[in-house]
Design a protein with these regions (language model features):
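Local sequence-structure signature of Cys/Sec-based thiol-disulfide redox active-site neighborhoods
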Residues: 61-76
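Short alpha-helix boundary/capping elements
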Residues: 82-89, 126, 155
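Short cysteine/histidine-rich zinc-coordinating motifs and their immediately flanking basic loops
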Residues: 90-96
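Post-cleavage N-terminal segment of exported redox proteins
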Residues: 1-64, 103-181
Length: 181
């Protein structure tokens, strides 16, 4: 393969979940005062719980999951940017995103809902224009409803409207001796 050619990457397995132990939702673990999402496996056994579990499966296997694969034009997953299935503080956790939207985004100079933000992830990070259907999932699609259900559940006990929750986003990096590229 020449430098101007590309080869499709082989699908990668979803990463195994990390067990953070028994921590009640909304309670701090340690001295950092970081929000804790509900423990894995504690979603209710009802239709909402089914949607939460589907949402988590889509989140960790976005490019290969039957409900979401047609919207993904590469081998990216939500978990590729939002580590530990969107649970990990300091790695763009989804519990912090849920309580911070709607929000103004400088990228498109308007107020975005959480649905529009997720659609943006499909469009830009997962290359939806190159996907089988050529666009991000519709707002009322099974894919987005399941993802929203999962993200909503992760934010159980989070203070709504807190756009500065500790652990939100990524940590600031110190400049290296060589600087940044």
């Amino acid at each position: 393969i020449g430098p101007a050619q590309t080869q499709a990457a082989a699908p990668l397995p979803a990463s195994p979940p990390i067990d953070h132990g028994p921590v009640d939702p909304g309670r701090s673990q340690g001295a950092e005062e970081l929000f804790q999402p509900p423990a894995r496996g504690t979603a209710p056994n009802d239709p909402m719980g089914d949607a939460i579990r589907r949402g988590e499966a889509i989140f960790v296997g976005t490019y290969s999951h039957p409900e979401s694969a047609r919207y993904v034009g590469n081998t990216q997953t939500c978990e590729g940017c939002h580590l530990d299935a969107g649970r990990l503080a300091g790695a763009a956790p989804m519990w912090a995103a849920w309580v911070a939207y709607p929000a103004f985004r400088t990228k498109d100079h308007r107020i975005n809902s959480i649905v529009e933000r997720i659609q943006g992830c499909f469009t830009y990070s997962m290359n939806a224009p190159a996907s089988a259907v050529g666009h991000a999932p519709e707002a009322d699609s099974a894919t987005l409803v399941a993802l929203q259900s999962y993200i909503y559940w992760l934010a159980t006990g989070a203070p709504t409207g807190d756009t500065r929750m500790p652990g939100r986003g990524y940590p600031a990096l110190d400049p290296t001796p060589q600087g940044f590229d």
